[in-house]
UniProtKB/Swiss-Prot annotation:
This is Sorbin and SH3 domain-containing protein 2. It comes from Sus scrofa (Pig). It is found in: Cytoplasm, Perinuclear region; Apical cell membrane; Cell junction, Focal adhesion; Cell projection, Lamellipodium. Residues 86-99 have a biased composition (Pro residues). Transmembrane segments: none annotated. Pfam families: Sorb. InterPro entries: SoHo_dom. Keywords: Amidation, Cell junction, Cell membrane, Cell projection, Cleavage on pair of basic residues, Cytoplasm, Membrane, Phosphoprotein, Ubl conjugation. Interacts with ABL1/c-Abl, ABL2/v-Abl/Arg, ACTN, AKT1, CBL, PALLD and PAK1. Interacts with ABL, CBL, DNM1, DNM2, FLOT1, AFDN, PTK2B/PYK2, SAPAP, SPTAN1, SYNJ1, SYNJ2, VCL/vinculin, and WASF. Interacts with PTPN12 and WASF1 via its SH3 domains; this interaction may mediate the partial PTPN12 and WASF1 translocation to focal adhesion sites.
């Protein structure tokens, strides 16, 4: 694996990302007339590469760049197939788990099940009132939820 040039030392970060992507995904094709270990790579797409540039490694050749395919059939050639490699078995779907007890009989109802009919929630909504009608400790919602019981006048604590 090659050492990458730090992004801070590159003038154009977008070009650096492109170059790194091409170096990572480059497919080496051996040529008959060239030596792959001693051939210098050049990148002649209009970018300036001087010997004094910030890159420590030259860019990859664009002629040899080809995205890696996911399967051998995508390449269109049988050169990469190995006859001794085993063929993976076809995909078998996992078995379906048995139905849960609550799924078996939908006619049984429990206390925690949602109600069959919709509940009118308008009575629980508080309508905005004027600030001048505010009474501390008094709530219209509490009056709807439970009736106010007044203490009996006959009993007094001493």
């Amino acid at each position: 694996m090659r050492a990458a040039t730090p992004l801070q030392t590159v003038d154009r970060p977008k070009d650096w990302y492109k170059t790194m992507f091409k170096q990572i995904h480059m497919v080496h094709k051996p040529d008959d007339d060239t030596d792959m270990y001693n051939t210098p790579y050049t990148y002649n797409a209009g970018l300036y590469n001087s010997p004094y540039s910030a890159q420590s490694h030259p860019a990859a050749k664009t002629q040899t760049y080809r995205p890696l395919s996911k399967s051998h059939s995508d390449n269109g050639t049988d050169a990469f197939k190995d006859a001794s490699s085993p063929v993976p078995p076809p995909h078998v779907p996992p078995p379906v788990p048995p139905l849960r007890p609550r799924d078996r009989s939908s006619t049984e109802k429990h206390d925690w099940d949602p109600p069959d009919r919709k509940v009118d929630t308008r009575k629980f909504r508080s309508e905005p009132r004027s600030i001048f009608e505010y009474e501390p400790g008094k709530s219209s919602i509490l009056q709807h939820e439970r009736p106010v019981t007044k203490p009996q006048a006959g009993r007094r604590k001493v």
